């Protein structure tokens, strides 16, 4: 989208600086496609005991009982975000637009709310590793529900995390405390965890803006804890274990980042994470550059008819690996 390119030229790539201008650019495109977006129904379900642990389910437009399942964790800097954003100009279309998009690609889509770090905007007192626990709770709910398929067929599941949502997926995939559970999804369970897509994820925080310090301390702990518990730190510990990706129950990864993502907070940490992962596992990690997008725009562009190529690539990757 030319408007996003122009925004990067005039405003730069800083996430907070581009947030509302990006919403203003994309809102009219979403509203224009409102009927098509809402043509895919969503139902809301509870996946845990905390009031925040609810999820929206968007059934595949094809065969829901056999389709792959995508679980999407949205971004929001660990302190914000909802499965339906309450931003008036967006008219409750985000993230229904994402659920609708992947549904029409033949992929049943689940979008959970998760616990957030306390801030001036609210929060549920989230403290590490609550994000990984919420990922775990969604997978357990999925393994037990008969909403999608009462016949007990094995379902192939993919995780997708955008920005802070990707931190929670990385916690689940790399934290030793979830090891046995991850391995169970590779075995005889009716849920098979096949892959994870990380979109614009800050895999480490050495170059994070100073304004994030309070949030990082509340969630991760001390400076030492932040280094150890961020995805890069967890991956480093994985390397020291000398175990293969398969032995650790870690599925295939697809790493995506945007052309106009900030270099300091996103692109540099992405490069370092991918290089370390490839060194540890001695295999290539697929990386996709999302052309023409900034940090905020990829999920919001889906179902607008423009800038959807990244979603098509993610859907194709899911289908190839299924």
Which sequence ranges carry the predicted segments?
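Structural cue for short, hydrophobic secondary-structure segments
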Residues: 72-75, 111, 255
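C-terminal catalytic histidine-bearing segment of alpha/beta-hydrolase fold enzymes
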Residues: 256, 263-274, 278-322
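Mobile cap/lid helix-loop segments that gate and shape the active-site cleft of serine hydrolases
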Residues: 29-37, 201-244
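Short, surface-exposed "cap/lid" segments of acyl-processing enzymes
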Residues: 61-101
């Amino acid at each position: 989208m030319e408007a996003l390119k122009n925004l990067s030229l005039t405003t730069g790539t800083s996430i907070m600086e581009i947030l509302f201008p990006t919403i203003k650019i994309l809102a009219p495109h979403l509203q224009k496609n409102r009927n098509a977006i809402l043509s895919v129904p969503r139902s809301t379900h509870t996946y845990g005991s905390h009031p925040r642990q609810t999820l929206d389910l968007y059934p595949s437009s094809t065969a829901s009982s056999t389709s792959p399942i995508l679980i999407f964790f949205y971004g929001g800097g660990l302190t914000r975000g909802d499965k339906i954003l309450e931003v008036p100009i967006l008219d409750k279309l985000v993230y229904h637009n994402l659920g609708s998009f992947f549904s029409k690609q033949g992929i049943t889509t689940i979008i959970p709310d998760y616990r957030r770090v306390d801030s001036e905007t609210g929060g549920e007192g989230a403290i590490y590793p609550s994000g990984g626990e919420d990922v775990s709770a969604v997978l357990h709910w999925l393994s037990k529900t008969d909403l999608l398929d009462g016949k007990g067929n094995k379902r192939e599941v993919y995780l997708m995390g955008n920005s802070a949502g990707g931190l929670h997926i990385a916690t689940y995939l790399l934290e030793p405390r979830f090891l046995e559970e991850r391995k169970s999804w590779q075995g005889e369970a009716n849920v098979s965890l096949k892959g994870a897509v990380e979109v614009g994820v800050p895999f480490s925080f050495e170059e994070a803006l100073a304004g994030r310090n309070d949030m990082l301390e509340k969630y991760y702990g001390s400076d030492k804890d932040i280094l150890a518990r961020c995805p890069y730190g967890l991956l480093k510990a994985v390397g020291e274990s000398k175990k293969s990706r398969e032995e650790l129950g870690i599925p295939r990864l697809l790493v995506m980042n945007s052309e106009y993502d900030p270099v300091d907070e996103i692109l540099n940490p992405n490069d370092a994470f991918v290089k370390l992962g490839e060194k540890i596992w001695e295999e290539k990690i697929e990386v996709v550059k999302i052309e023409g997008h900034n940090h905020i725009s990829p999920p919001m562009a889906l179902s607008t008819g423009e800038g959807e190529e990244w979603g098509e690539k993610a859907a194709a990757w899911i289908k190839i690996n299924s």
